[in-house]
């Protein structure tokens, strides 16, 4: 008796599968629209090994005297923007700008940590130090995003002939990226 019930159940199950097979089922289709918006974004920071421009030692008596040479230095920032996004990187005037300093033509100075003496310096976009780096869209560095962090070089010069006392001179310049 159990064998008959099992056989009937098996036949019923098989018949139900045949009755609802995909060959006999109706279908309907619709499109699913899928979208995403990728916004332009940028970040700027000191990055690995960046964020500092150290000029080293300034020698106002011999090497960097009025008859000597300027002191050069190089630093870097880490910049990342969305692929193919355009941006402009600007550098502020620093904490101790000289009289007459403007956003377009910054007259930057480092201050002696132990006094109120200043050591003037300039920042440039190019290794030849011909294009001054300012804090306006016209004096900033154009940048095209690659989607990856990119080191951006900052070139500096401390002009020769500055008669200053010994000590450690510092300044902080705000780097801004506008995108």
From Swiss-Prot:
InterPro entries: Spore_coat_component (IPR053167), Spore_coat_U/FanG (IPR007893). Keywords: Secreted, Signal, Sporulation. This is Protein U. Its main location: secreted. The gene is pru. The keyword Signal applies. Residues 1-25 form the signal peptide. GO terms for cellular component: extracellular region. It comes from Myxococcus xanthus.
